[in-house]
Design a protein with these regions (language model features):
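Transmembrane-helix signature of polytopic, membrane-embedded enzymes
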Residues: 7, 83-89, 109, 114-137, ...
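Short helix- or helix-capping micro-motifs
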Residues: 131-136, 143, 163, 190, ...
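Juxtamembrane segments of multi-pass membrane glycosylation machinery
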Residues: 71-102, 124, 139-140
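Short acidic/glycine- and proline-prone juxtamembrane loop motifs at membrane-interface regions
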Residues: 27-28, 146-154
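Transmembrane-helix motifs of polytopic, lipid-linked glycan transferases
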Residues: 97-122, 160-164
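Membrane-interface transmembrane helices that cradle and orient dolichyl/undecaprenyl
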Residues: 161-182
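Hydrophobic core segments of transmembrane alpha-helices in multi-pass, intramembrane catalytic enzymes
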Residues: 33-35, 39, 107, 154-162
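Extracytosolic helix-loop segments that constitute the early lumenal/periplasmic catalytic or substrate-binding loops
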Residues: 15-19, 31-69, 75-88
Length: 200
């Protein structure tokens, strides 16, 4: 029972709250964020394959607008855009709304990372479970997890970086050798963290 209640909560939390991410409308800056992503993607394709795709949207400060989250959400896009709840929309609207689910799934993942951080610090499984439930149900974070393609991904990756920092610190305190994989992980996720919110 010590862990069962947490996973029962998590199951219903994903099912029920996940639906709200589909029902949340598009905010005022999501189209801009999406267009910056498309232009940056075109820029990469132009560089790699000598193409001449449109990158005009990056004029001015647009190219410094972080797009790291979209690398992650692109993996889910082909599947999420086919959900029946999105069938009435055009393809671009489907893609933007599908990112809401990607944000929400990343938020749930951040909850699991949060639980691991608590266990690293306190080593009390029940306390970690309850803390994670309160974290996931915190109204401000939960509300933003339905649509915010900037702050929630940044928070989630920041927690992952924090987990690896604490893990490495604990190993060093115990005078043990830190495995190279931890440095690779924290380097990768720190780079991703900076790419999500470069400025603003």
């Amino acid at each position: 029972f010590k862990n069962l209640y947490f996973y029962i909560f998590l199951f219903f939390f994903v099912l029920i709250a996940g639906k709200f991410s589909l029902d949340t409308g598009i905010t005022h800056d999501e189209l801009h964020d999406y267009n910056v992503w498309l232009a940056n993607k075109n820029l990469i394709l132009n560089f790699l394959f000598n193409k001449n795709l449109d990158t005009s949207y990056l004029a001015g400060g647009g190219k410094f607008y972080g797009i790291g989250f979209h690398y992650y959400s692109s993996f889910f896009e082909p599947f999420l855009t086919k959900l029946p709840q999105l069938s009435e929309y055009d393809i671009n609207t489907k893609k933007i709304l599908s990112k809401h689910i990607s944000v929400y799934l990343l938020f749930v993942t951040s909850g699991l990372i949060f639980k691991r951080i608590i266990k690293l610090i306190i080593n009390d499984n029940n306390f970690a479970n309850l803390s994670t439930i309160f974290y996931l149900l915190y109204p401000y974070l939960l509300g933003h997890s339905f649509f915010n393609v900037k702050d929630i991904p940044f928070l989630s990756i920041w927690l992952i970086c924090t987990y690896f920092m604490i893990k490495i610190s604990k190993i060093l305190v115990e005078n043990k050798r830190v495995a190279k994989k931890y440095f690779i992980f924290i380097t990768f996720f720190t780079g991703l963290l900076l790419s999500i919110r470069i400025s603003g």
